[in-house]
């Protein structure tokens, strides 16, 4: 089926290229493990060689494009960009990714990243000279075992897509394993079942997206030390595990191409929802990028909405088109119908984190379940949440009691308890001085929710606490 779709897309591209110039050319983003993607990957390697040689003041350079996502607050004696040593020297459009806690990220995360990698794609297309270049994706959510291995060019130490500050086993050609593999196997089907846009956007961000960022940089155990050439520090968080440096690892783009692919699969499904102009205006974000000629482009909410459902590319197994049957997203605060305050520390690999009863007067089919957490330092690894799990039964991600996996990628981004929160996007802090993160699950409405957390990777010494549980109305 996939080969048939790819063939049809290729035929469509051929016919498009032979039509009038007014018609939009369509590009095909391909699986980075496929033979069909080899020319695009080579073009990307060629482009990154050129982009890495450009100065960081050039908007089409590797450094500038990566810094649009984020860049460290301070880099004393910056060896890669002498004109940037601290946050007062930020250049136009730098530090604009949607890793904030303002609430606006719950609508803009997927949309902003779609626009971001689309502009990088255009720059690579022109820089490489490959006129039909499309950004390859790393399809680690596929069921093929080969797709669990990082694609070869990104592992080749002689290529310009290679980065040393990654999990050693990935660079050595070993497949994703352990907690991260469990997360992919269990979470992907769960994500595709979500019917609420805000919850889908947030869940994909905090599970597969964040989980893979952490795994690529640090693995399941977070016990490897790597030198990060961007921050110029040695730590146990590789380049991809740190929001401030993630965009500098070339695998970032193949990773986010796959996240965008998941987004489109959901949009095309019966569960997909679309945002409106009013919703974008009510949750403003900077959509500020550079085109392939290095020209600054600022997009209004109207322009963003006109583009995001009418992109000029498809995936080799997904057509990127507007789903005319999709419903409108319900964006905004939803009424809390029940609250519980377990205030329990997560000190065991597996333990109960509380019980919350539904409101007896609530008659909706679904509710939104929120788990409020606090911690001193960002927890590593992955955690799995189970609902009404039978005592003595193994914890498996294909169990009907599995709610989902959570990661804490970026949870300490902009920590206001020290001098790191100088550029905005500050992490929230609890009354007792701890960092905070809230996870949301879309669940069926039942009488009682007994919740269990299972740590499938990482360590236990992070002072993680579940403070509060809430149930919210699924509808506005």
Label for each model-derived stretch:
Residues 19-476:
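Intrinsically disordered, flexible peripheral segments
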Residues 15-17:
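C-terminal motif of bacterial Sec signal peptides marking the signal peptidase cleavage site
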Residues 2-8:
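Sec-dependent signal peptide recognition
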Residues 11-12:
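Repetitive helical segments and hydrophobic/amphipathic motifs
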Residues 1-2, 29:
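Generic cytosolic/nucleocytoplasmic N-terminal low-complexity/intrinsically disordered segments
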């Amino acid at each position: 089926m996939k080969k048939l779709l790819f063939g049809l897309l290729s035929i469509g591209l051929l016919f498009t290229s032979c039509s009038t110039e007014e018609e939009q050319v369509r590009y095909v983003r391909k699986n980075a493990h496929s033979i069909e993607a080899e020319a695009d990957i080579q073009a990307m390697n060629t482009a990154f060689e050129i982009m890495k040689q450009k100065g960081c003041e050039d908007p089409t350079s590797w450094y500038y494009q990566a810094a649009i996502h984020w860049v460290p607050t301070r880099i004393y004696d910056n060896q890669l960009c002498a004109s940037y040593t601290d946050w007062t020297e930020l250049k136009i459009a730098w530090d604009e990714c949607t890793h904030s806690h303002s609430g606006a990220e719950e609508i803009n995360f997927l949309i902003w990243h779609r626009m971001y990698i689309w502009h990088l794609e255009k720059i690579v297309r022109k820089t490489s000279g490959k006129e039909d270049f499309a950004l390859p994706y790393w399809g680690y959510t596929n069921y093929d075992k080969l797709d669990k291995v990082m694609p070869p060019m990104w592992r080749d130490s002689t290529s310009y897509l290679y980065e040393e500050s990654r999990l050693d086993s990935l660079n050595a050609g070993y497949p994703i394993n352990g907690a991260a593999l469990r997360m992919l196997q269990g979470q992907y089907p769960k994500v595709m079942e979500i019917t609420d846009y805000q919850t889908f956007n947030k869940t994909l961000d905090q599970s597969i997206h964040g989980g893979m960022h952490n795994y690529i940089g640090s693995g399941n155990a977070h016990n490897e030390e790597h030198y990060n050439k961007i921050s110029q520090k040695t730590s146990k968080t590789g380049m991809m595990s740190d929001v401030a440096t993630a965009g500098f690892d070339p695998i970032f783009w193949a990773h986010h191409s796959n996240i965008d692919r998941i987004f489109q699969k959901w949009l095309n499904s019966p569960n997909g929802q679309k945002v409106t102009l009013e919703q974008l205006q009510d949750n403003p974000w900077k959509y500020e990028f550079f085109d392939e000629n290095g020209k600054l482009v600022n997009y209004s909410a109207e322009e963003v909405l006109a583009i995001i459902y009418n992109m000029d590319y498809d995936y080799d197994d997904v057509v990127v088109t507007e789903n005319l049957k999709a419903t409108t997203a319900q964006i905004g605060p939803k009424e809390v119908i029940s609250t519980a305050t377990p205030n329990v520390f997560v000190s065991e690999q597996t333990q109960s984190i509380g019980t919350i009863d539904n409101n007896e007067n609530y008659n909706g089919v679904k509710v939104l379940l929120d788990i409020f957490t606090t911690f001193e330092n960002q927890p590593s690894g992955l955690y799995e949440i189970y609902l009404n799990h039978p005592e003595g039964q193994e914890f498996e991600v294909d169990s009907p009691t599995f709610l989902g996996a959570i990661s804490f990628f970026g949870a300490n981004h902009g920590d206001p308890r020290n001098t790191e929160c100088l550029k905005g996007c500050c992490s929230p802090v609890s009354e007792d001085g701890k960092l905070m993160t809230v996870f949301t699950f879309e669940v069926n409405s039942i009488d009682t929710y007994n919740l269990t957390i299972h740590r499938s990777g990482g360590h236990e010494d992070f002072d993680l606490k579940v403070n509060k549980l809430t149930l919210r109305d699924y509808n506005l």
